[in-house]
């Protein structure tokens, strides 16, 4: 899976889980501040990323994933 494919899939998951429009999502978007996620939304997003990409994201790493770019970079580096 290429980085571009990972980005597209992450965007799809964000749209599905957070109920935002795709055009609202930017690479620098913060899940809480820009996309309106609360802590439960963020946990559900991390769980969906783990499931979709077959990666384990430990809690200490999940706490550092606050933007779309950070989520994509994390997955790219784990693949």
From Swiss-Prot:
GO terms for biological process: lipid A biosynthetic process. 4'-phosphopantetheine is transferred from CoA to a specific serine of apo-ACP by AcpS. This modification is essential for activity because fatty acids are bound in thioester linkage to the sulfhydryl of the prosthetic group. Pfam families: PP-binding (PF00550). Keywords: Cytoplasm, Fatty acid biosynthesis, Fatty acid metabolism, Lipid biosynthesis, Lipid metabolism, Phosphopantetheine, Phosphoprotein. GO terms for molecular function: acyl binding; acyl carrier activity. Signal peptide: none annotated. Residues 4-79 form the Carrier domain. Its main location: cytoplasm. InterPro entries: ACP, ACP-like_sf, PP-bd_ACP, Ppantetheine_attach_site. The modification O-(pantetheine 4'-phosphoryl)serine is found at residue 39. It is found in: Cytoplasm. Pathway: Lipid metabolism; fatty acid biosynthesis. GO terms for cellular component: cytosol; membrane. NCBIfam families: acyl_carrier, PRK00982.1-2, PRK00982.1-3, PRK00982.1-4, PRK00982.1-5. Belongs to the acyl carrier protein (ACP) family. Carrier of the growing fatty acid chain in fatty acid biosynthesis. This is Acyl carrier protein. It comes from Pelodictyon phaeoclathratiforme (strain DSM 5477 / BU-1).
């Amino acid at each position: 899976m290429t980085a571009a494919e990972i980005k597209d899939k992450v965007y799809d998951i964000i749209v599905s889980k957070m109920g935002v429009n795709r055009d609202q999502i930017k690479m620098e978007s913060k899940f809480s501040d820009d996309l309106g996620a609360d802590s439960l939304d963020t946990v559900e997003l991390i769980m969906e990323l783990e499931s979709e990409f077959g990666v384990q994201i430990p809690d200490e790493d999940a706490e550092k994933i606050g933007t779309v770019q950070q989520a994509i970079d994390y997955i790219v580096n784990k693949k």
